[in-house]
């Protein structure tokens, strides 16, 4: 037996090999623990990433569903600014900067007064629409643009005030998610809510319900409000928009228009501290901007025609500026007409030899000289064409073929005249080649007493309504699209659209939809012969099978509700027209 001291010493001495094994085991365990912790951390991070991704997917899906819901229920019309329609570079700069600063509340006065509505007004042709496109571009660059609506009298989608609020609600909902959530919830809760039933108070309620503010001030721009609605519908729309802008600090409204009585009266009744008015005729830079624009347009003409420079010479150039009197449309129309003549130099001299009127009178005189040069005087067939063109414009821009059919003139004449009058008319490719006037002042000119081809809108409506009835009597027939099975729903007919295009001409489509719009104008008890003629045409139409064929076409086009509206309008008109007070 070993002494106690030896046993104790052996306990203190560790076998080096055993010590190494123990250390390796400890390191192995530490490494395994570290790897386990790392694996756990990776799994945690992966779970969190997957949860975040799922949240993002859910949010994206919710956003997509809400956007689809808004688009489906609000049915916003297509409208917006176009960069190529803005003011020429170097013009309107001071005014544009002033508007941008107003949006950004850069002045102490703007911060204190919170005048959140800006009304820019001026005469026809002064450049309001180009200015609106430039304003939209500037605001878009700075993330301030919420939406824009460019009114047009010759486009039914852009001439109805009822279309403005839905598109603004839709635009704001797209760029401001908290607002979108509120609108989407209301649409889900009320399946009967439609764009037509939306009240202005509802828009204001939407605005008030937003729990937070957008990062930037947001602006709605409405251009050419005078081309939308009438003197009864516009004030209500203006009240909704100005009330909304006055009640929340982050929303501003910019409106451009002519000084129509109802619009001017509305703003005069507002307190001056709630809005900013701006008369474009008082713009201090207007003359310099007009000269810059005119010089640019003439220089392009000089380059295209290889004319001597400078042209026009200083005296003629100044006379052009004087005649324009601030109207950019005068310059653009003059240059367009010179582009289409055989001798621009001689044509400019002729144009400047006219009377010394300026502004709008000078513009109308220019329109007259263009018509005189291209059409001549007392052209009865052209009268029919321009009458059909202007009368159908509020409903749809029609192509050459349809105008020719409804006016009862040869197609080649319509084509030639539209080409010749390129400074006044154009074919809108976005509307299937529909013919439009280049500027609303051209429409005003044709319906004024200053035009040799003056259009009496009421008489033109009646004559076009009769032409629509004649078109339907001539072209309507049973099973017009030659369908094999009349029991099929429209959605079950694969080639329905191609059949419509092949068998239902554009003139027949237009006539079926709008004959009563033209025919049922307020009665004129001074012209009983016209009333007798109209009633006779209606009798011819309704005594045959044509009403059934008409309803068939409406059904194929998916426009059956138009039939009910038409008949209600017709019944009301017949009652009024045949009452003793009108006979």
Question: Where are the predicted features?
Answer:
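Conserved NB-ARC/NACHT P-loop NTPase core of NLR-like innate immune receptors
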Residues: 2, 8-465, 482-484, 491-501, ...
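Secondary-structure edge/capping motif, primarily at the C-terminal ends of alpha-helices
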Residues: 106, 490, 519-526
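A broadly conserved detector of short glycine/acidic/proline-rich loop/turn motifs that flank catalytic sites
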Residues: 441, 470, 514
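Short acidic-capped amphipathic helix/loop micro-motif used as an active-site/signal-coupling element
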Residues: 465-481
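Extended HEAT/HEAT-like alpha-solenoid repeat tracts in very large eukaryotic scaffold/adaptor proteins
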Residues: 503-514, 518
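Flexible, acidic glycine-rich loops studded with aromatic residues
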Residues: 507, 522-529, 536, 540, ...
């Amino acid at each position: 037996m070993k002494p106690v001291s030896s046993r104790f010493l052996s306990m203190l001495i560790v076998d080096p090999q055993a010590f190494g094994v123990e250390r390796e085991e400890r390191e192995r365990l530490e490494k395994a623990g570290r790897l386990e912790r790392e694996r756990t951390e990776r799994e945690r991070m992966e779970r969190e990433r997957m949860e975040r991704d799922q949240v993002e997917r859910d949010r994206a899906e919710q956003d997509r569903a809400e956007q689809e819901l808004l688009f489906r229920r609000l049915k916003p019309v297509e409208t917006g600014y176009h960069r190529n329609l803005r003011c020429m570079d170097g013009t309107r700069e001071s005014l544009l900067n002033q508007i941008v600063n107003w949006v950004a509340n850069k002045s102490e006065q703007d911060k204190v007064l919170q005048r959140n509505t800006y009304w820019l007004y001026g005469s026809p042709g002064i450049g309001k629409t180009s200015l609106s496109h430039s304003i939209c571009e500037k605001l878009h660059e700075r993330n301030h643009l919420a939406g824009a609506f460019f009114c047009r009298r010759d486009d039914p989608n852009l001439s109805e005030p009822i279309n403005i609020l839905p598109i603004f609600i839709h635009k704001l909902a797209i760029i401001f998610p908290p607002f979108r959530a509120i609108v989407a919830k209301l649409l889900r809760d009320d399946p009967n809510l439609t764009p037509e039933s939306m009240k202005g108070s509802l828009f204001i309620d939407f605005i008030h319900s937003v729990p937070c503010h957008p990062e930037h001030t947001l602006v709605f721009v409405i251009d050419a409000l005078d081309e939308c609605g009438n003197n009864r519908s516009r004030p209500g729309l203006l009240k909704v928009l100005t009330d909304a802008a006055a009640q929340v600090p982050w929303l501003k409204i910019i409106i451009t228009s002519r000084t129509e009585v109802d619009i001017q009266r509305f703003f005069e009744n507002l307190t001056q501290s709630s809005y900013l008015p701006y008369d474009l005729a008082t713009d201090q830079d207007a003359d310099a901007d007009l000269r810059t624009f005119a010089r640019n347009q003439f220089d392009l003409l000089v380059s295209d025609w290889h004319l001597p420079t400078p042209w026009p010479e200083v005296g003629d150039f100044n006379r052009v500026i004087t005649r324009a009197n601030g109207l950019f449309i005068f310059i653009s129309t003059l240059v367009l007409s010179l582009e289409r003549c055989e001798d621009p130099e001689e044509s400019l001299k002729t144009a400047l030899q006219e009377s010394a009127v300026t502004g709008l009178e000078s513009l109308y005189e220019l329109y007259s000289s263009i018509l005189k040069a291209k059409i001549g005087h007392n052209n009865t067939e052209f009268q029919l064409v321009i009458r059909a063109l202007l009368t159908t414009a509020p409903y749809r821009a029609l192509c050459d073929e349809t105008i020719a059919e409804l006016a009862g003139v040869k197609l080649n004449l319509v084509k030639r005249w539209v080409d010749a009058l390129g400074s006044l008319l154009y074919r809108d490719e976005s509307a299937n080649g529909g013919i439009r006037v280049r500027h609303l002042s051209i429409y005003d000119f044709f319906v004024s007493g200053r035009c040799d081809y003056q259009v009496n809108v009421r008489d033109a409506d009646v004559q076009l309504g009769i032409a629509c009835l004649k078109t339907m009597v001539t072209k309507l027939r049973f099973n017009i699209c030659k369908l094999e099975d009349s029991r099929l729903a429209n959605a079950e007919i694969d080639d329905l659209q191609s059949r419509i295009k092949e068998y239902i001409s554009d003139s027949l489509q237009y006539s079926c939809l709008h004959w009563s719009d033209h025919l049922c104008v307020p009665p004129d008890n001074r012209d009983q012969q016209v009333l007798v003629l109209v009633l006779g045409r209606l009798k011819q139409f309704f005594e045959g099978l044509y009403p059934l064929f008409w309803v068939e076409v409406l059904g194929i086009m998916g426009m059956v509700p138009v039939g009910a509206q038409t008949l209600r309008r017709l019944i009301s008109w017949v009652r009024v027209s045949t009452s003793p007070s009108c006979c």
